[in-house]
Amino acid sequence: MVSTETLLHPGGYRTPWHSHRAGQLWRIATGLLVIESQRGRSVVPAKHIGWIPPGNQHAAFSESAIEGCAIYLDPACCTRLPDVPALFEPDDLTHALFSRLSVAESEYDPRKLTLLLDELAVAPQVHFTLPVPTDPRLKDVVRHLLQFVDDNQTVESHARQAGMSVRTFNRRFRAQTGMNFVNWRQLARVMQAMEWLAAGKPVGWIALSCGYSSVSAFIEVFRAWTGKTPGQWAVKEVPFGRR
């Protein structure tokens, strides 16, 4: 059994914790969605396919407007998909199959569903994808911040260097990444912190190297994005985002 739903949500969209009897596949066309589950938070960027298994408790929110579609699968159809929330990076064929199924108004082609599930079973899974803006001036800012994650320049300073007003900088940055500048920089730091934690760097050194004035401030931001403290993250057997 398959049903579909169009996803159209304004900025500031948020759901309470809930679950579905059906498995849920969804693709975000525009915007950026954050999924909270028992396993932590995952950033779901546009052009990816997300997955929530039947009965899995989760909540969702987004700062930006969301456009996309969802496909709900009977639990009997979900055996080849992960039993935990996942994010897939689909190829063109998978995108096309998803689109065909999502616009089926009454009946769907079971062959297309089987092929979609086959493709997702081997599709690469990603987590914590950091969107990159398309504007070359914003790209320069992003490259700098990825290289120097301890940079604490204000948004006014970055806007001035990019040759934009603060208002234009913020508007374009949000439009092209689905995030505001402050949250984007936080996520960039969290992702870098994950790499350093995996390399065995101490939390205090990481906090300073990420531009935080105190370890407690770093821990608070890290926990907000991952649901774990840096110490808890470091002892996990499987790094988040490689499941």
Outline where the language-model segments fall:
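N-terminal regulatory/effector-sensing and dimerization cores
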Residues: 1-87
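Short hydrophobic/aromatic patch on the recognition helix
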Residues: 47, 169, 173, 217-218, ...
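Amphipathic alpha-helical segments enriched in hydrophobic/aromatic residues interleaved with Lys/Arg
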Residues: 78-146
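Basic, amphipathic alpha-helical hairpins
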Residues: 101-105, 119-126, 140-157, 173, ...
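Short, Lys/Arg-enriched anionic-surface-contact patches
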Residues: 128-137, 171, 177-186
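Terminal helix-turn-helix DNA-binding modules in bacterial transcription factors
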Residues: 152, 156, 175-219, 235-243
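Helix-turn-helix
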Residues: 159-163
